Amino acid sequence: MKRIIGLTGGIGTGKSTVSNYLASIHRLPVLDADVYARVAVQPGSPVLSQIAERYGAGVLLSDRTLNRRRLGEIVFSNPAERRWLEEQIHPYVRDRFLAELDALEAQQYPTVVLVVPLLFEAGMTDLVTEIWVVYCSKEQQMQRLMERERLSLEQAQARINSQMPIEEKRDLASIVLDNSSTLESLIKQVDLALKTPNY
């Protein structure tokens, strides 16, 4: 593959909007870390067993699936617990990325997109050839997060603060996609970024 795009940004900045556009309009293969992270904690998985052992049955719903809201309350208010959880999940996500990239390489796809919200924090920048950061203001992040997840101001703030500041991610980007304006503006930036020579 000539291009492996690492698509990242802060929570609520618009990564899904960009990845959906790249998949549906540009027909690019999109591999999503969040999808793999959900698979990692499916009922019966070693990771879910470790989570239940550490935090008790309260993090499981009656059908033995993960109670995401309860786990979120624990890890987003305690950086040490969040790090522990990430240490359980990130190796699985990395292995899935590597396996999928191998399969796509065999199919000779020229460009692949990896959606990795914690690209920098999880140390996965070595998997990509360029980094696209979807950016918007912290105020916009807060508003989107509160509306989408129905979180309180304090809960939204805690989730945003759990990630590397968006300004730092922006400074490390190959390409910055500014999502503080209209969808049309964002789409134009994505189209232009795809035409930009590989980094």
Locate each region found by the language model.
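Hydrophobic anchor at the beta1->P-loop junction of P-loop NTPases
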Residues: 7
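ATP-binding Walker
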Residues: 13
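Walker A/P-loop
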Residues: 16
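Short beta-strand-centered segment that lines the nucleotide-binding/catalytic pocket of NTP-utilizing
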Residues: 28-41
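ATP-dependent small-molecule kinase phosphotransfer cores
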Residues: 38-110
